[in-house]
Amino acid sequence: MSLLQFSGLFVVWLLCTLFIATLTWFEFRRVRFNFNVFFSLLFLLTFFFGFPLTSVLVFRFDVGVAPPEILLQALLSAGCFYAVYYVTYKTRLRKRVADVPRRPLFTMNRVETNLTWVILMGIALVSVGIFFMHNGFLLFRLNSYSQIFSSEVSGVALKRFFYFFIPAMLVVYFLRQDSKAWLFFLVSTVAFGLLTYMIVGGTRANIIIAFAIFLFIGIIRGWISLWMLAAAGVLGIVGMFWLALKRYGMNVSGDEAFYTFLYLTRDTFSPWENLALLLQNYDNIDFQGLAPIVRDFYVFIPSWLWPGRPSMVLNSANYFTWEVLNNHSGLAISPTLIGSLVVMGGALFIPLGAIVVGLIIKWFDWLYELGNRETNRYKAAILHSFCFGAIFNMIVLAREGLDSFVSRVVFFIVVFGACLMIAKLLYWLFESAGLIHKRTKSSLRTQVEG
């Protein structure tokens, strides 16, 4: 890449970054937080944060990258995607009408809400316990990170339930919403994330998500400022780099440490070059249609229920890894959101996907606002826990693609909804047995005096 070519790419990158950052800033000033703000920051991180890192790798370490015209296509496709997404998100689908009382879809009380977070936490802890009994601490047993996907590891399906510890702790926080509950959320979820990091063998997702939710709650409540958020972001990048070194068993120093930091940080937070690689091989792609979305559900079907279930699921990430890159190392390489759309239907699917994503984020913001307006604090805690708990799925959306997002968000909704139903059923059984006693002012006063 020549300096002239880099200059042209830099101008496009700067214009796209300023365009998205400006719209995000205006939205932040208007509402302080919603899921449009979160997705916009996530989109910036995924598709634009990596460009400066790539530039340093090219000019400082002479690392080979895709041709400049392909990198330009990647930047422009990301910028155009966001423009279509933003217009879709801001388009009002129906006329604003005055709020009229409606019969609520469901209600929550204190006992049902507490039962819900206990069940969610129980699912996570029991899953971790069973996985640990089968495999021990994989971080200290395996020689390479790719081995966690091998046949040596049993009970892999249990990992999908680990994440429900975070929604459980979110319910606990939203029931109190003070600084102590906020700090308790951070300590409990990060400690759990570190535990799963050691047990699973290097998976950092729970730590990243817990830290991100903690920061956004702090921004919403005004407990941290923007400069504190930026400082925490830098700390998070350094922390993720250190965990990556431990995961891959690397011991580096000097120039090698700087080089390793650049490419690991780029691959962790901003795999935009994967989109460029996909576009570089555009003519070799056999468009998959909506099949990757259907195939991604295969992993949730037990083998005893479907004996002939394919052992290898050809979703967009695996198609990109195996068919496009011819990489069979055992690790799936993230195609990114836009890359998954290209795999499914080529360039035509990019604006269509942007419209779909705009509607998805719009729905989450509608649900979030519903929680903000809810007068029943127990129901509000459940709604907010569901919305913030889905942040993991939005990260999957930006990094892994639309197919991975759809299967995971459906799984999340089913498990979360099942926990709600079980909590309500248990409450009904306890109430029928006479074990539930309503609190009265006199009993509360007696407890305080006693």
Curated annotation (Swiss-Prot):
InterPro entries: WzyE. The keyword Cell inner membrane applies. Probably part of a complex composed of WzxE, WzyE and WzzE. Coiled coil: none annotated. It is found in: Cell inner membrane. The chain crosses the membrane at residues 6-26, 37-57, 63-83, 118-138, 155-175, 181-201, 207-227, 228-248, 341-361, 378-398, 410-430. Probably involved in the polymerization of enterobacterial common antigen (ECA) trisaccharide repeat units. It comes from the Bacteria. It is a multi-pass membrane protein. GO terms for biological process: enterobacterial common antigen biosynthetic process. Pathway: Bacterial outer membrane biogenesis; enterobacterial common antigen biosynthesis. Keywords: Cell inner membrane, Cell membrane, Membrane, Transmembrane, Transmembrane helix. Belongs to the WzyE family. The gene is wzyE. Pfam families: WzyE. This is Probable ECA polymerase. GO terms for cellular component: plasma membrane. It comes from Escherichia coli O139:H28 (strain E24377A / ETEC).
